[in-house]
Amino acid sequence: MEEEGEAQGRAVPGGRLNMSHGFVHHIRRNQLARDDYDREVKQAKEKQKKRYTPGPTRQKKPDLQVYHPRQREKAHTTETLKDEPNDNGTQLFCLDFEADGGEVTSIIVYEDDDAEQLATMISNQNQLEGDMREALKQRIQEEISKRRVQR
C-alpha cells in the first residue's frame, strides 16, 4: 500500500496528464464561447444594411501653382510703330528684325516708306549703334528698290 500512495503522488507510468482537476476544461469552454461570439458579431455586421454615407468633407489641397511663361510681345506692325497707318501705298514686304536678345520686330513696308525713317524706328526700339542703323537703312533701301522693280 505504501507503494500505491507513492504512485499517486508521482506521475503515472503511462505519461498521461491528470485531467481530473477540470482546469483545461474551463480554458476549452472559454475558447468555444469566444469563437461563437466572434461568429455572431461577423454575421451581424454582414446583415447590417450597407448604405452610402458621405464622410466628412476633407479640405482639398490647394491647386498647385503652375508657371505660365509670359507671352512674347506680339509682332510690331507699322500701325503700332507709326503715328498713322500708311493706307495709300501698296504693301511691298514685311520686315522682321531680330535683335541680339532674340526679340523680333516686324514692320510692314509700303512702297512710299522712307528707308531712313524705318531704320531709325527700328534702331531706337532695339538700341542699335550708328553703323548698324546705316547698314539696316541700306538693306531696307535695297529691298524696297528691288520690289519696286518687280511690280
From Swiss-Prot:
InterPro entries recorded: UPF0561
Similarity comment: Belongs to the UPF0561 family.
Chain segments carrying region Disordered: 1-89
Protein name (record): UPF0561 protein C2orf68 homolog
Record's compositionally biased regions (Basic and acidic residues): 32-46, 70-85
